[in-house]
Amino acid sequence: NTVSSFQDILMRMSKMQLGTSSEDLNGMITQFESLKLYRDSLGEAVMRMGDLYSLPSRNGKWREQLSQKFEEIRWLIEEVRHRAKMTENSFEQITFMQALQLLLEVEQEIRTFSFQLI
C-alpha cells in the first residue's frame, strides 16, 4: 500500500541526520509529500467518473502539471539513488532503497491515472 509506504518513508527520512545536507533532506521530504498529494488527487479524479472529464477542462494546465511532476519524480529518483550510494549507514541505505521503490511505484500509478484522464 503506497499510502502507508509514504508515511513510513517520510517518518524514516525525518529521523535521519545527514549533517550539512539536512536542508536538502527536508526538501526531499517536502517533495515526497507534494507528490503524494498530487497522486492522491489524480486517483480521486479517476474514481469520480464525473470528474474524469471535467478535470482537463477545469484545469487547462493539468498536462503541464503532469509533465512537471514527472520531472520532479525523475529528479527525486536520481537524488535518492545518489544518496543511497553515498551513505555507509545501513538504515539510510534501506530507507533510500525503499524510497526509490516507492517513487517507481508512484510514477507508474500517476502514468496509469493520467492515461485514464486523457
Swiss-Prot record:
It comes from the Viruses. Belongs to the influenza viruses NEP family. The keyword Transport applies. Average number present in a viral particle is estimated to be 130-200 molecules. Keywords: Host nucleus, Host-virus interaction, Transport, Virion. It is found in: Virion; Host nucleus. Pfam families: Flu_NS2. GO terms for biological process: exit of virus from host cell nucleus through nuclear pore. Its main location: virion. A motif (Nuclear export signal) lies at residues 9-18, 82-91. This is Nuclear export protein. The gene is NS. Binds M1 protein. May interact with human nucleoporin RAB/HRB and exportin XPO1/CRM1. GO terms for cellular component: host cell nucleus; virion component.
